[in-house]
């Protein structure tokens, strides 16, 4: 599955939105990938996550003990990808603004892959890596359905992206006039 195949799934689901969006990262963009419109369809989710699992396996990372998803956005793709990798899925969630592994006991030395939905700046993955390191868990790679940065985001580890789709993103004080003229909407989930 290549980038065009992935974007075709997003288009079928009506998940490529145009307007003025405040991304989870705080950056502004004329395009928003509303993955919830994809993930509400089990068949589309399975297709994408199976392909992502195959790409992870092809990366020859050695044994993987768990898949870790950052809540909220990474929950569905991490679970579905773990199903295809045939390993357990766990997640981190924010507690006082910091990712914590609250509901699971993952042994020290376990080898994990972090699976995220969309990467823009890589912050959620970096924060998940910090959490794993604090617990003595080895992050062997991160993976995502779409890398909006087209490989430019620093995620702190090897990033395996099913698709790279570079979309412009701007700081709020550096918007092009045509974007600034459109009222901004904030559809992300970081502060939930």
Swiss-Prot record:
Its cofactor is Mg(2+). GO terms for biological process: 'de novo' UMP biosynthetic process; pyrimidine nucleobase biosynthetic process. Orotate binds at residues 120, 148. InterPro entries: OPRT, Orotate_PRibTrfase_bac, PRibTrfase_dom, PRTase-like. 5-phospho-alpha-D-ribose 1-diphosphate binds at residues 116-124. Pfam families: Pribosyltran. GO terms for molecular function: magnesium ion binding; orotate phosphoribosyltransferase activity. It catalyses: orotidine 5'-phosphate + diphosphate = orotate + 5-phospho-alpha-D-ribose 1-diphosphate. Disulfide bonds: none annotated. Its EC number is 2.4.2.10. It comes from the Bacteria. It is an enzyme of class 2 (transferase). The keyword Transferase applies. Catalyzes the transfer of a ribosyl phosphate group from 5-phosphoribose 1-diphosphate to orotate, leading to the formation of orotidine monophosphate (OMP). Homodimer. NCBIfam families: pyrE_Therm. Belongs to the purine/pyrimidine phosphoribosyltransferase family. PyrE subfamily. This is Orotate phosphoribosyltransferase. It comes from Brucella anthropi (strain ATCC 49188 / DSM 6882 / CCUG 24695 / JCM 21032 / LMG 3331 / NBRC 15819 / NCTC 12168 / Alc 37) (Ochrobactrum anthropi). The gene is pyrE.
């Amino acid at each position: 599955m290549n980038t065009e195949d992935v974007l075709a799934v997003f288009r079928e689901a009506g998940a490529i939105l145009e307007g003025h969006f405040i991304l989870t990262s705080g950056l502004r963009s004329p395009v928003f990938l509303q993955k919830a419109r994809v993930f509400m369809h089990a068949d589309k989710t399975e297709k994408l996550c199976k392909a992502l699992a195959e790409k992870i396996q092809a990366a020859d990372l050695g044994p993987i003990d768990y898949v870790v998803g950052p809540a909220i956005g990474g929950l569905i793709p991490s679970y579905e990808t773990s199903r295809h990798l045939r390993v357990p899925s766990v997640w981190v969630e924010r507690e006082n603004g910091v990712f914590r592994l609250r509901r699971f006991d993952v042994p020290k030395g376990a080898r994990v892959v972090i699976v995220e939905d969309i990467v823009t700046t890589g912050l959620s993955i970096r924060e998940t890596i910090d959490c794993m390191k604090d617990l003595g868990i080895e992050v062997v790679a991160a993976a995502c359905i779409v890398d909006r940065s087209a490989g430019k985001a620093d995620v702190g580890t090897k990033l395996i992206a099913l698709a790279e789709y570079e979309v412009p993103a701007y700081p709020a004080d550096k918007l092009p006039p045509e974007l600034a003229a459109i009222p901004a909407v904030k559809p992300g989930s970081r502060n939930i």
